[in-house]
Structures are given as structure tokens and as C-alpha cells.
């Protein structure tokens, strides 16, 4: 497997396996990792992760597991057995759920994927949180969940780049994965709390998830190269 030389993760947000692999074939595993989300994973039935790994990609399995502790831990174990590089769970599942996942991965003799907690989705603002009974700012809720993740032994968090400085200050050992990244001049789409790649890295993010600016570009390879150049400045 080629070691990726950048913090970029390209989201393979497609409805079919064929479309996802068509994009993957245009990308260099040395310049990006790839993310497999719910739609692609579900529609592909099985094998998409293994196929991407065989192509040299490190795979972030973005299924945001959230269930009772044992069920979630077994799902994380299954993801590890597929060879994923990173897997995530919802921090709102609680301390016992996250700790169970950590303990299950610790039993493995082989490589362990990074175990990442999802805090507050980047599409959510204060009024969205209020709608589910949380009368708090997104950043305050992120910090609450981050403290739980740290206590549970998680490797990192998914968070907005706007929350990254506070998270790095409070939990410097956690690796921060930031979606909602848009290169300068890109449309915001449905992501609300966004920054450019360079701004996100400067804010403390360790990994950057980019979707449509690359996946929907006329030339995805060129779009990826442009983002790499923007990062390297």
C-alpha cells in the first residue's frame, strides 16, 4: 500500500460502486485517502472497501456507528477485519459505547484502524441542536463530547475546523478530521461551518475531507493536484 503523503481524504459519495471506482481510478493513493460513506457502502453490498485497499488506498469507513456498546464494538471489529484505515462512531452513544469499541480493537494482533468520534455534524447550527432538545452552541456541545471521547481512549474526532483550535487546546493528543472543506471559490453546498484547506490545517485539523470540489470536477486528478498545491503553498 502506498503511504499517503497528504492529509486529504476524498469522499466517494456516489450511489454506485461503478461510479466510485471510476473516480478512484483517477486519483493517486499517494496524494489522498478515500472515504466510503453510508450510501456507497450500502449500495455496494460488499467488497468495496477491499477493492479500494487493493488499489492502494487507505480507507476511512464513515458509517458513524451508534448503538448499544456490544453491537457497536462488533461493528468496529468487522470494519477492522476489512482492512480500513479509519472508522468512526457517534460520541453521543456515550462513554461505555466508545470504550467498548476501544477495548475490542485492543484485542487485535494486527493493524488497528484509527477510532474516531463524531461530535456535531457540520450541517448543524444552534437552531438544529435546539430542535433535538440541546439548547447549546455547536462548539459547546463539541467540547462536551470531546471530553467523553478522550476519556474513552478514542484516537480522534470528526469536527468542524471552526472547533479545531479549542479542541487542540483542550485535547492535543486527539487527531482532528474535518469535513466541510471547500477550496477557495467553491460552493458551500449543504455544509455550514466551513474553511479552506489551508485555513483548516492552520486551525489545527489533521485530516481534511473533500467531496464535490474533487468528485464533481471535470478533471478530478487536476482538482486534487490543485488542492495539494494549495496546502503546500
UniProtKB/Swiss-Prot annotation:
- Gene3D superfamilies named in the record: Aldolase class I
Q: List the disulfide bonds.
A: none
Pathways involved = Pyrimidine metabolism; UMP biosynthesis via de novo pathway; UMP from orotate: step 2/2
The positions making up the signal sequence are none
Q: Name one GO molecular function term.
A: orotidine-5'-phosphate decarboxylase activity
List the catalytic residues: 64
Binding-site positions, substrate: 13, 35, 62-71, 122, 182, 191, 211-212
- Domain of life here? Bacteria
InterPro entries the record matches: Aldolase_TIM, OMPdecase, OMPdecase_AS, OMPdecase_bac, OMPdeCOase_dom, RibuloseP-bd_barrel
What GO biological process terms does the UniProt entry carry, in alphabetical order?
A: 'de novo' pyrimidine nucleobase biosynthetic process; 'de novo' UMP biosynthetic process
Q: In the UniProt record, does the keyword Lyase occur? A: yes
| E.C. code | 4.1.1.23
The record lists the catalysed reaction(s) as: orotidine 5'-phosphate + H(+) = UMP + CO2
Pfam families in the record, alphabetically?
Answer: OMPdecase
| Top EC category | lyase
Q: SMART domains under this entry?
A: OMPdecase (SM00934)
Q: Which GO terms describe its cellular component?
A: cytosol
UniProt family annotation: Belongs to the OMP decarboxylase family. Type 1 subfamily.
What this chain does, per the record?
Catalyzes the decarboxylation of orotidine 5'-monophosphate (OMP) to uridine 5'-monophosphate (UMP).
UniProt protein name? Orotidine 5'-phosphate decarboxylase
Amino acid at each position: 500500500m502506498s503511504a499517503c503523503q497528504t492529509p486529504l481524504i476524498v469522499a466517494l459519495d456516489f450511489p454506485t460502486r461503478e461510479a466510485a471506482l471510476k473516480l478512484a481510478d483517477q486519483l493517486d493513493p499517494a496524494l489522498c485517502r478515500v472515504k466510503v460513506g453510508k450510501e456507497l457502502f450500502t449500495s455496494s453490498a460488499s467488497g468495496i472497501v477491499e477493492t479500494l485497499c487493493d488499489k492502494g488506498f487507505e480507507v476511512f469507513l464513515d458509517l458513524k456507528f451508534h448503538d448499544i456498546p456490544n453491537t457497536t464494538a462488533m461493528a468496529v471489529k468487522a470494519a477492522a477485519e476489512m482492512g480500513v484505515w479509519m472508522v468512526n462512531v457517534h460520541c453521543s452513544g456515550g462513554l461505555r459505547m466508545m470504550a467498548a469499541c476501544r477495548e475490542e480493537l485492543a484485542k487485535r494482533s494486527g493493524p488497528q484502524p484509527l477510532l474516531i468520534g463524531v461530535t456535531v455534524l457540520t450541517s448543524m447550527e444552534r437552531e438544529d441542536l435546539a430542535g433535538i432538545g440541546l439548547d447549546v452552541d455547536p462548539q459547546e456541545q463539541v467540547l462536551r463530547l470531546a471530553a467523553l471521547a478522550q476519556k474513552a481512549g478514542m484516537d480522534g474526532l470528526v469536527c468542524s475546523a471552526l472547533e479545531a483550535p479549542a479542541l487542540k487546546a483542550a485535547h492535543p493528543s486527539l487527531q482532528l478530521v474535518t469535513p466541510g472543506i471547500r477550496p477557495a471559490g467553491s460552493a458551500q453546498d449543504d455544509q455550514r461551518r466551513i474553511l479552506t484547506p489551508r485555513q483548516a490545517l492552520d486551525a489545527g485539523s489533521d485530516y481534511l475531507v473533500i467531496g464535490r470540489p474533487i468528485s464533481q470536477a471535470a478533471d478530478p486528478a487536476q482538482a486534487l493536484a490543485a488542492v495539494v498545491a494549495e496546502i503546500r503553498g
